[in-house]
């Protein structure tokens, strides 16, 4: 899978060319033939007074007097995680959390008392809203799971901000394979002192019926504002207690936003970190040289244990019923 992804990401730049062309014709169509004449601010002359070169320097300071348009990435640091929000897609660019056995063993939060809410940290016109998901057929998929933030009710409540959500396929993904994957990440804390997890959406290209690469994804809401990712990534950075942070154990995974069979090998979704960087535009582990990164899947079995997950859920439900 990783080699196909690497090849496909190189084609994404093609879209930028068509975008420039569209912008040009859109502008001309809007303005008619009255395309602004960028009159030179000053001209160089030779000793005979002949014009040599006209120079136009864009005055950025004057432009910014009208206001700075962005783009803006809304960063929010909560008790259990941080998120960086993409106003264009109404999804996070990424979320980041660190879990330990100690933090997971604190059971002071209960999701029964948590509610999905818009993130008021984001300007209203760019927020994802509850109504955007209503009737869409997609789950409000946590990027940082509520189960990772049980150490306080406030921490758990913060995982229900819509800035921590993306539209996810429910049956076969969010309620199944993705949930098993989250559980597998938590189980890593039995071997490692701390486990840091980056999670986020991707919008990856695929070939159309003409054999051309293109990016297609649904948009939900009214008006349609919230993008439905084609894929999701997780980058896992695990450290053993007492070992230096300069040589962590690392694994990266890219999963499609669609139903996945319970027995499908997790390792088939493993990719180099560079694949996630190229697709997301993020620089990940930039302070950790590649030679210092240990392969997580060489130290642990990168395989989901669905049976254990199902049994643990049944046990929790049984305990809650007492």
Curated annotation (Swiss-Prot):
Cofactor(s) this protein requires: Mn(2+); Mg(2+)
Chief localisation class: mitochondrion
Residue sites binding Mg(2+) per the record: 174
Pfam families: Endonuclease_NS
Biological process according to GO: mitochondrial DNA catabolic process; mitochondrial RNA catabolic process; transcription elongation by RNA polymerase I
GO MF annotations in UniProt: DNA endonuclease activity; DNA nuclease activity; metal ion binding; nucleic acid binding; RNA endonuclease activity; RNA nuclease activity; single-stranded DNA endodeoxyribonuclease activity
PROSITE patterns: NUCLEASE_NON_SPEC
Entry GO CC: mitochondrial inner membrane; mitochondrion; nucleus; RNA polymerase I complex
EC number: 3.1.30.-
Active site as annotated: 142
CDD domains: NUC (cd00091)
Keywords: Endonuclease, Hydrolase, Magnesium, Manganese, Membrane, Metal-binding, Mitochondrion, Mitochondrion inner membrane, Nuclease, Transit peptide
Subcellular location: Mitochondrion inner membrane
More details: The active site contains 1 hydrated divalent metal cation that has only 1 direct interaction with the protein; all other interactions are via water molecules.
Subunit description: Homodimer.
Function of the protein: This enzyme has both RNase and DNase activity. It degrades single-stranded DNA and RNA.
Family in the record: Belongs to the DNA/RNA non-specific endonuclease family.
Protein name per the record: Nuclease 1, mitochondrial
Species this protein is from: Schizosaccharomyces pombe (strain 972 / ATCC 24843) (Fission yeast)
Lineage: Eukaryota, Fungi, Dikarya, Ascomycota, Taphrinomycotina
Gene label: pnu1
């Amino acid at each position: 899978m990783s080699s196909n992804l690497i090849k496909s990401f190189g084609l994404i730049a093609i879209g930028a060319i068509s975008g420039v062309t569209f912008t040009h014709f859109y502008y001309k169509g809007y303005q008619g033939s009255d395309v602004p004449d960028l009159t030179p601010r000053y001209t160089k002359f030779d000793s005979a007074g002949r014009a040599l070169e006209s120079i136009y320097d864009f005055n950025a300071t004057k432009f910014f007097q009208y206001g700075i348009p962005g783009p803006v990435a809304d960063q929010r640091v909560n008790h259990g995680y941080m998120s960086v929000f993409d106003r264009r897609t109404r999804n996070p660019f990424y979320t980041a959390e660190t879990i330990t056995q100690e933090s997971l063993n604190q059971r002071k939060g209960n999701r029964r008392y948590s509610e999905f809410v818009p993130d008021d940290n984001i300007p209203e016109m760019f927020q994802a809203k509850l109504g955007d998901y209503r009737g869409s057929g997609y789950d409000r998929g946590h990027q940082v799971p509520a189960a990772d933030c049980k150490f306080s009710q406030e921490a758990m409540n913060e995982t229900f901000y819509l800035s921590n959500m993306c539209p996810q396929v429910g049956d076969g993904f969010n309620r199944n394979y993705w949930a098993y994957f989250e559980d597998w990440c938590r189980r890593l804390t039995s071997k490692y002192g701390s486990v840091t997890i980056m999670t986020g959406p991707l919008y990856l290209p695929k070939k159309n019926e003409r054999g051309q690469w293109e990016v297609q994804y649904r948009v939900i809401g009214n008006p349609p504002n919230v993008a439905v990712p084609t894929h999701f990534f997780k980058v896992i950075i695990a450290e053993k207690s007492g070992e230096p942070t300069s040589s962590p154990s690392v694994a990266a995974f890219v999963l499609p936003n669609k139903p996945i069979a319970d027995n499908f090998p997790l390792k088939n979704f493993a990719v180099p970190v560079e694949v996630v960087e190229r697709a997301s535009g993020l620089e990940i582990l930039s302070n950790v040289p590649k030679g210092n990164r240990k392969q997580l899947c060489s130290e642990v079995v990168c395989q989901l244990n669905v049976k254990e997950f199902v049994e643990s859920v049944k046990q929790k439900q049984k305990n809650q019923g007492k």
